[in-house]
């Protein structure tokens, strides 16, 4: 069995926008649950506009995608929104195949994601 480093999630806020950086595999089990709890806490503390940077995750599965969809729905219900940052590669391919890029605005950079708000 291959052990993978734990998912690391951090956030920073500037001008009402919350930037979330994720490092590690966003897959079923602890990683997806960790992200979900982190995001629920962020929303409960008032975050409404969130940019999630996925550039440092090498892999995402359906559980990770589900966590992002739930966050998007939660923010929309609060009058906010979710934007994703994801460059080319396996994760962007997964987001495209699942059509998540059509449901959640996805950009190549944080600057572009910010301009999308």
For each predicted feature, which ranges?
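Amphipathic alpha-helical interaction surfaces in cytosolic regulatory modules
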Residues: 25-104
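A short, charged, amphipathic alpha-helix used as a generic interaction element across diverse proteins
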Residues: 116-117
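Short acidic-hydrophobic, aromatic-tinged amphipathic segments that line or gate anion-handling sites
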Residues: 105-109
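Acidic phosphotransfer microenvironment of two-component signaling modules
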Residues: 89, 111-112
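Short secondary-structure boundary/capping segments
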Residues: 1, 9-11, 74, 96
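STAS-typified acidic loop motif
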Residues: 3-37
């Amino acid at each position: 069995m291959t052990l993978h480093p734990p998912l690391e999630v951090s956030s920073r806020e500037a001008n009402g926008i919350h930037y979330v950086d994720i490092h590690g595999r966003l897959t079923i089990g602890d990683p997806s649950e960790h992200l979900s709890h982190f995001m629920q806490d962020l929303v409960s503390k008032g975050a409404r506009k969130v940019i999630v940077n996925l550039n440092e995750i090498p892999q995402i599965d359906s559980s990770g995608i589900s966590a992002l969809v739930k966050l998007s729905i939660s923010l929309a219900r609060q009058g906010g929104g979710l934007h994703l940052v994801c460059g080319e590669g396996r994760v962007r391919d997964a987001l495209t195949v699942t059509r998540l890029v059509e449901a959640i605005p996805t950009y190549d950079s944080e600057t572009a994601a910010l301009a999308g708000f």
